[in-house]
């Protein structure tokens, strides 16, 4: 099979244009139509032979031109001017001026003939002059001697006389052998310069001698011509070699320069390539092929080829992940970085750090923490001179309270976290928004489990701890034992060489309260607490509830900026416009600065405690962010419920699980979370407690409907059911329970869980009946006319049909009648009619055995 090439492919191989190749084909009479025509192997060989011949011709032509180069230096000023004048003259007359090298041989021959004529004329003139002198003096002998002298000094005397006329601007020469002259001329530039200077000096001396002596010279004509020829040959050879050396020097310089330029170009190209390699591209987690191609500046088709080579089949609109895209980008020499794409929510809520000059001192936020009944609320009561403890149900703090205390003209914000273990989550949130934690430990009880928990929360939140040893007024108080116990957890007193402040106090007798406040301010000064009040507000929700008259109410601690009435805010998954703000003393205010707790009204829904409050520019932004968050919460709930249901189903199938469903309604969000956490922790291997709904507010009809459909109980904490909800609950037989103390909730649920455990049952046979007649009914199916043999048959009892000693059915009665009336039971000796659930294959003579499952008391 012959090899064929298209014209454009052959031209590309030869590195010539298609047009030039087609011209060659025309010269060789090779048939073709256009650049897409195919060439046979013979045609290709003909073209190659033609190109080689042309190159050989060019080479021969170049050699001929090189041979015709001038034999002596073209550069004498008079000749140069004449040549330039002739060229200009020819050009003015419309003739094209030829290149200086084109007719160099002819010019040199003309110059040589002109020199010969000039030399002959000079020689004849000198001869006539010498003959005249000889006739007058008659001293021929002397002339002959002079001739011999001249012969000895022929080059020295004749050359200086002829040179000024023949070579107007040429440098003077001195007598040296031809080989020595050429060798010395090109070996050392410095030596050549020195010799030139010597020659100049020697020439001047010779001219001076001639001028002074003015001696008569007689020279033989043939000898003079011979001398002239030798001198001229020497000069021509020397000038040619010099010119050749100059040209060679220029070529070497050009080669050197081109080499340097190539090296510079290589360095520049390398630098550009390195810069290109160092070019960074940021690629997101997912990107379409088209977008990726535009990003790296490559054709999409080329990128798709690379993908295919990697085993990824994708078109221009399909997405590729970061790993695949980074492989291709690195292959092209890019440095890859992963682009972190911010969501719309993150862009809208992006927070920037405040410059140092805008920051101002702010009050410290102090949280009071400790074990239950160690006197946290009593201590806070003593500090703020209020009486909160008596108002709390059971004397236990149920939700977070916030207050501001002024000490020596400076403000301190206090948060009170509940002490019961069910409020762990609330205490953790309290620790996250505070600067200082006051750990209250009873001097008589010492360190308790929740004390350790409080220490861990404070340390995790990087909060400075001040220990308040309370109840020192009691006789059994032992502060030193408390210090010893706390030192085991890293809280070492200052007097022991540590850095933890310990203060002995008595909340009941108000001992050491002032010292505690001074220590709080001292620690706050060391922390250098600052914030920028002149910016949009940001804060945290401490507590939230649904008020019957005011709607959703949130207690917020402002952390940055200033919150004003009328501001649009986003709080968790809800939003709103601040309609009113109420401080800790119950007074309405218009603005709240950093570290100030306030109640805000105007939210669309009840937020979750711990949610961040962010002030935004307008209503549209607030709605957009809230909507995004709500959708995300829905997705998360769907995913979580799917996972939990899968796990639940697996355990139910194994027969290991029973479920108690609970609906929780409470007055504040903190109580909702605490109850939910406490109830769900009651689950064990046999019974699972599942909170199917938890919210803030009164018990509504929708809650009752949900409980009825889900077979759940409703727990109300500090709330009452609506009128319609109560009546609906009675109708649907839904269990609603009201509580004010969390202990009661836990105890009741434990009792309910015990009732759900699988009891032990036994089978009790209550009677037998015989089928004596069969009736067919289109509406109810087969009816068995029976006679009760013994015991009794009840409507709620289970039935077993025995035929020839074999059980053919076991199930429930569908109906029990005497004549046309439904009855609850039929005693022995009476006739009755019976139907069975999903069973009609009844025959005369079958025995019906009625039985019940009775619980065995443990």
From Swiss-Prot:
Region feature G2, mapped onto this chain: 395-399
Region (G1): 370-377
Cellular compartment(s): Cytoplasm
CDD domains recorded: IF2_eIF5B (cd01887), IF2_mtIF2_II (cd03702), mtIF2_IVc (cd03692)
Residues spanning the membrane: none
Region described as Disordered: spans on this chain: 59-147
Region (G3): 416-419
Annotated stretches, region: G5: 506-508
Predominant subcellular localization, coarse grouping: cytoplasm
Record PROSITE patterns: G_TR_2, IF2
Record GO terms (molecular function): GTP binding; GTPase activity; translation initiation factor activity
GO cellular component, one term: cytosol
InterPro entries attached to this UniProt entry: EF-G-like_DII (IPR053905), IF2_II (IPR044145), IF2_N (IPR006847), P-loop_NTPase (IPR027417), Small_GTP-bd (IPR005225), T_Tr_GTP-bd_dom (IPR000795), TF_IF2_bacterial-like (IPR000178), TIF_IF2 (IPR015760)
Annotated GTP binding sites: 370-377, 416-420, 470-473
Keywords: Cytoplasm, GTP-binding, Initiation factor, Nucleotide-binding, Protein biosynthesis
Positions of region (G4): 470-473
Domain of life: Bacteria
Sequence ranges assigned to domain tr-type G in this UniProt record: 361-530
Entry similarity comment: Belongs to the TRAFAC class translation factor GTPase superfamily. Classic translation factor GTPase family. IF-2 subfamily.
Protein purpose: One of the essential components for the initiation of protein synthesis. Protects formylmethionyl-tRNA from spontaneous hydrolysis and promotes its binding to the 30S ribosomal subunits. Also involved in the hydrolysis of GTP during the formation of the 70S ribosomal complex.
HAMAP family from the UniProt entry: IF_2_B
The protein's name: Translation initiation factor IF-2
Provenance organism: Caldicellulosiruptor saccharolyticus (strain ATCC 43494 / DSM 8903 / Tp8T 6331)
């Amino acid at each position: 099979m012959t090899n064929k090439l298209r014209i454009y492919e052959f031209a590309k191989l030869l590195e010539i244009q298609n047009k030039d190749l087609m011209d060659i084909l025309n010269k060789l009479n090779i048939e073709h139509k256009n650049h897409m025509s195919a060439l046979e192997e013979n045609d290709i060989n003909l073209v190659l032979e033609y190109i080689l011949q042309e190159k050989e011709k060019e080479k021969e032509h170049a050699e001929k031109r090189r041979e015709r180069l001038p034999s002596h230096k073209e550069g004498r000023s008079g000749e140069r001017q004449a040549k330039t004048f002739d060229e200009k003259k020819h050009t003015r007359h419309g003739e094209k001026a030829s290149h200086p090298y084109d007719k160099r041989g002819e010019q040199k021959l003309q110059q040589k003939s002109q020199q010969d004529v000039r030399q002959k004329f000079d020689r004849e003139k000198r001869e006539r002059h010498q003959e005249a002198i000889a006739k007058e003096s008659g001293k021929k002998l002397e002339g002959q001697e002079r001739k011999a002298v001249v012969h000895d000094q022929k080059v020295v005397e004749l050359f200086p006389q002829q040179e000024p006329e023949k070579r107007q601007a040429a440098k003077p020469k001195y007598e040296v052998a031809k080989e020595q002259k050429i060798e010395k001329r090109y070996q050392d530039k410095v030596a050549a310069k020195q010799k030139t200077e010597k020659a100049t000096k020697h020439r001047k001396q010779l001219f001076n001698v001639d001028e002074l002596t003015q001696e008569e010279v007689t020279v033989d004509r043939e000898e003079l011509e011979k001398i002239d020829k030798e001198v001229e040959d020497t000069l021509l050879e020397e000038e040619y070699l010099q010119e050749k050396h100059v040209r060679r020097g220029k070529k070497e310089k050009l080669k050197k320069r081109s080499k340097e330029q190539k090296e510079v170009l290589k360095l520049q190209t390398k630098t550009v390539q390195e810069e290109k390699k160092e070019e960074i591209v940021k690629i997101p987690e997912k990107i379409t092929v088209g977008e990726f191609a535009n990003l790296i500046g490559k054709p999409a088709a080329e990128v798709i080829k690379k993908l295919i080579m990697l085993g990824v089949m994708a078109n221009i609109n399909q997405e590729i992940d970061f790993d695949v895209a980074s492989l291709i980008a690195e292959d092209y020499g890019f440095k890859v970085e992963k682009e972190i794409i911010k969501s719309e929510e993150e862009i809208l809520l992006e927070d920037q750090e405040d410059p140092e000059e805008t920051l101002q001192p702010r009050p410290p936020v102090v949280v009071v923490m400790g074990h239950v009944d160690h006197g946290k609320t009593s201590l806070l009561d003593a500090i703020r001179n209020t009486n909160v403890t008596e108002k709390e149900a059971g004397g236990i703090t149920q939700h977070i309270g916030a207050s501001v205390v002024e000490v020596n003209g400076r403000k301190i914000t206090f948060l009170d976290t509940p002490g019961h273990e069910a409020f762990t989550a609330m205490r953790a949130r309290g620790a996250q928004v505070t600067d200082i934690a006051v750990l209250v430990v009873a001097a008589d009880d010492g360190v308790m489990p929740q004390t350790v928990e409080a220490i861990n929360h404070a340390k995790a939140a990087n909060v400075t701890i001040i220990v308040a040893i309370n109840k020192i007024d009691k006789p059994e108080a032992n502060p030193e034992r408390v210090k010893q116990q706390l030192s085991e957890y890293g809280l070492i007193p200052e007097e022991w060489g540590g850095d933890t402040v310990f203060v002995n106090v008595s909340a009941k007798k108000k001992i050491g309260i002032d010292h505690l406040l001074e220590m709080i301010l001292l620690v706050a000064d060391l922390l250098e607490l600052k914030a920028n009040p002149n910016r949009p507000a940001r804060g945290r929700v401490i507590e939230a509830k649904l008020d019957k008259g005011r709607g959703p109410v949130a207690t917020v601690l402002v952390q940055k900026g200033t919150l004003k009435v009328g501001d649009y805010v986003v709080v968790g998954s809800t939003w709103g416009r601040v309609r009113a703000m109420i401080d800790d003393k119950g007074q309405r205010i218009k603005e709240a600065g950093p570290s100030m707790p306030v109640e805000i009204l105007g939210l669309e829904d009840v937020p979750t405690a711990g949610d961040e409050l962010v002030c935004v520019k307008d209503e549209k932004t607030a709605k957009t962010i809230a909507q995004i968050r709500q959708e995300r919460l829905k997705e998360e709930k769907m995913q979580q419920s799917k996972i939990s249901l899968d796990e639940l189903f697996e355990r139910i199938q194994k027969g290991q699980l029973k479920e108690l469903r609970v609906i929780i309604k409470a007055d504040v969000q903190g109580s909702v979370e605490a109850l939910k956490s406490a109830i769900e922790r009651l689950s064990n291997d046999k019974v699972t407690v599942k909170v199917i709904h938890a919210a803030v507010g009164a018990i509504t009809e929708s809650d009752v409907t949900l409980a009825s459909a889900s077979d759940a109980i409703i727990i109300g904490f500090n709330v009452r059911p609506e009128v319609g909800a109560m009546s609906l609950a009675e109708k649907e037989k839904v269990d609603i329970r009201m509580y004010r103390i969390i202990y009661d909730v836990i105890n009741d649920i434990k009792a309910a869980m015990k009732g759900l455990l699988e009891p032990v049952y036994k089978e009790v046979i209550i009677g037998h009946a015989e089928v004596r007649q069969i009736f067919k009914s289109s509406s109810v199916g087969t009816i068995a006319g029976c006679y009760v043999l013994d015991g009794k048959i009840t409507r709620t009892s289970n039935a077993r049909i025995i035929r020839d000693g074999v059980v053919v059915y076991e199930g429930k009665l569908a109906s029990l009648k005497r004549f046309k009336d439904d009855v609850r039971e039929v005693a022995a000796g009476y006739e009755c009619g019976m139907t069975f659930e999903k069973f009609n294959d009844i025959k005369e003579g079958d025995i019906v055995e009625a039985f019940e499952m009775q619980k065995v008391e443990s």
